[in-house]
């Protein structure tokens, strides 16, 4: 098996001393889509935000354990979190384009990193928008506001904004839950098309989505990782009753 790109060991997360994630250990392989499923409050989004230290932005969050990326524990005091979030990018549940042009949305991270050359920026915009499967829809209006796009288009621009910084890993926190089925389908197609270049971790409430596009699935309940397996194996032959009850809709 290929060496893991991300190794989580004994990870616990507390919100104001209340444990939200309980000693979770698992690893993620390169160029796979991993779905994280479970009911609300199960810990799946907490785990996701822990993988590029987004939890640090909340002063009430305390994290213990380790997350090893590129041979280094990202929770080391020496970690440059700006560089970390460039390599491990995130797409949120609600489309959150900045109130600026489509072009400026996509190059935002590049400008923060000091890139000013227009040719470099132009090429990055086209490549990222193509990667997010939205180039043909917006190539003639790059200087229009991204706010004027549909919800599905806005979310794909947000994907492009992450792609522009050349991440190794993309974290997606329920990226289609606020979208109509057609727009959600386009996002799924986009993610599946990116799998040969990126490692992706997807929090989803849709069992159908998890089964359609993910290679592996982790099921969370009350802060515990109950089961982690190949997606096909988990959905056909879950090893825990809680997993079976959840994926068959008996609770959630």
From Swiss-Prot:
Source organism, top-level taxon: Bacteria
Domain ABC transporter: 6-247
PANTHER family, per database record: ABC TRANSPORTER I FAMILY MEMBER 17
GO cellular component: plasma membrane
Record has Cell division as a keyword: no
GO molecular function, one term: ATP hydrolysis activity
Protein name: Phosphate import ATP-binding protein PstB 1
Function: Part of the ABC transporter complex PstSACB involved in phosphate import. Responsible for energy coupling to the transport system.
Subcellular location field: Cell membrane
Transmembrane segments: none
Predominant place of localization: membrane
EC assignment: 7.3.2.1
Keyword Nucleotide-binding appears in the UniProt entry: yes
Enzyme class: translocase
Annotated family: Belongs to the ABC transporter superfamily. Phosphate importer (TC 3.A.1.7) family.
Quaternary data: The complex is composed of two ATP-binding proteins (PstB), two transmembrane proteins (PstC and PstA) and a solute-binding protein (PstS).
Alphabetical UniProt keywords: ATP-binding, Cell membrane, Membrane, Nucleotide-binding, Phosphate transport, Translocase, Transport
A GO BP entry: phosphate ion transmembrane transport
Membrane topology: Peripheral membrane protein
Binding positions (ATP): 38-45
Recorded name of the encoding gene: pstB1
Known catalytic reactions: phosphate(out) + ATP + H2O = ADP + 2 phosphate(in) + H(+)
